[in-house]
Amino acid sequence: MPDRNIVVLTAPSGAGKTTIAHRVLEAMPDMQFSVSATTRAARPDETDGVDYHFLSPEEFRARIDAGDLLEYEEVYPDQFYGTLRSEVEDRAEDGPVLLDIDVKGALNVKRIFGDDALILFVAPPSLDELQRRLEGRGTEDRESLQDRLDRVEQEMDRADDCDAVVVNDDLDPAVEETLTRIRQFLSS
């Protein structure tokens, strides 16, 4: 696998990492997106194999047992997220790869790939703004929204373990900062 071509965006849910990831992919056509696997139900606008690889909990556990996952986490009972090793390794042969994963997974990727991976933490401008964004999605019931908010503090505490922090208080400058950091990393 070529050196220095793995880029990871990580953030608490609602910080804007997926939006930034889409903008990065638009601006850098040679960058490939690593599609994560999950056991959660697909949202109405999501496509299997494009947004996520949607697996049953049994299928996901079989992939864990087979060593097919680079990283994974059981976020809630029977709700797994993870990165298929083949997604990263196969795509990295053809050029830089972008991952959009949670903080724990991002730090595991860094542990495995070291300086060949750039980990960028996308931070919300404030916790109040993050809560507003999550509520605005309308995809969560009160209990799951509160669960997500409870995790935010733990995730924010890990920001300094990442290579850099990009504060997403205004999307366009956050995208530009992200692109600058990625281009510097890929050219070094």
UniProtKB/Swiss-Prot annotation:
Binding site residues for ATP: A11, P12, S13, G14, A15, G16, K17, T18
Main location: cytoplasm
Location of the Guanylate kinase-like domain: 4-183
A single GO molecular function term of this UniProt record: ATP binding
GO cellular component: cytosol
Leading EC class: transferase
Location(s), subcellular: Cytoplasm
Enzyme nomenclature, EC number: 2.7.4.8
Alphabetical keyword list: ATP-binding, Cytoplasm, Kinase, Nucleotide-binding, Transferase
CDD domains per UniProt: GMPK
Reactions that this protein is recorded to catalyse: GMP + ATP = GDP + ADP
Similarity remark: Belongs to the guanylate kinase family.
Its biological purpose: Essential for recycling GMP and indirectly, cGMP.
NCBIfam families with a match to the protein in the record: guanyl_kin
Protein name according to UniProt: Guanylate kinase
Species this chain originates from: Salinibacter ruber (strain DSM 13855 / M31)
Lineage of source species: Bacteria, Pseudomonadati, Rhodothermota, Rhodothermia, Rhodothermales
